[in-house]
Amino acid sequence: MSFNLIVDQGNSACKVAFIRNNGIESISFLPGKAGQALSHLVAPHRFDKAIYSSVGLPDEEAEAIVRSCAAASLMMGTETPVPLRLQYDRRTLGADRLAAVVGAHSLYPNTELLVIDAGTAITYERVSAEGIYLGGNISPGLHLRFKALHLFTGRLPLIDPSGISPKIAEYGSSTEEAITAGVIHGLAGEIDRYIDDLHAKEGRSAVILTGGDANYLARIIRSGILIHPDLVLLGLNRILEYNV
């Protein structure tokens, strides 16, 4: 029984979770670096354990805050032990990717897993039923595909995918529709291919989708999936409990 603080520093924002007895009690989003906003958020609380993780260079101020507000703390690094065996160069593996697969394996042990994190980039991670991280792939995310077509061509417009319906025509009847159909159908086909390969090769298996675009992508993928938007936070909590 513990009350834990999870601080996940991303590229443009910081996600802070309070987890009590392995269940998420609250999640807060802090723009930019955590700093003073984090200090105000955690000030009324005293945590049993705390973990700080960053996809880039660590924020020393945030690390100091995390250390000061808990009885025991952990700064996530490339040498931090995790409850998985890794077949990947740990030095090049992002903390968010690692936390996602740890979280997935903790939720679905003894299961062949494909973990899809749909953010700026889309990552595809494979975890064996025995708890071995077999590796992963990285692909451009939904928004990045639209931006690339606009930035690296002469006249193609920028399409905002935020308002696009999941029901897309097979072929477009305008340039805007053609871009939309090409990106959406292409991405859906890519994801379905990974899922089909998993199910064809493995018996008991599960596909877990997380990340900012997870809910939208779940509506365009024909294969059955499980959605866990807070997978990285759950994984960081599992790593914290494993070490402290």
Swiss-Prot record:
Its main location: cytoplasm. Keywords: ATP-binding, Coenzyme A biosynthesis, Cytoplasm, Kinase, Metal-binding, Nucleotide-binding, Potassium, Transferase. K(+) binds at residue 117. One of its GO terms (biological process) is coenzyme A biosynthetic process. Its cofactor is NH4(+); K(+). It is found in: Cytoplasm. GO terms for cellular component: cytoplasm. It catalyses: (R)-pantothenate + ATP = (R)-4'-phosphopantothenate + ADP + H(+). It comes from the Bacteria. Pathway: Cofactor biosynthesis; coenzyme A biosynthesis; CoA from (R)-pantothenate: step 1/5. Substrate binds at residues 94-97, 175. A monovalent cation. Ammonium or potassium. Catalyzes the phosphorylation of pantothenate (Pan), the first step in CoA biosynthesis. This is Type III pantothenate kinase. The gene is coaX.
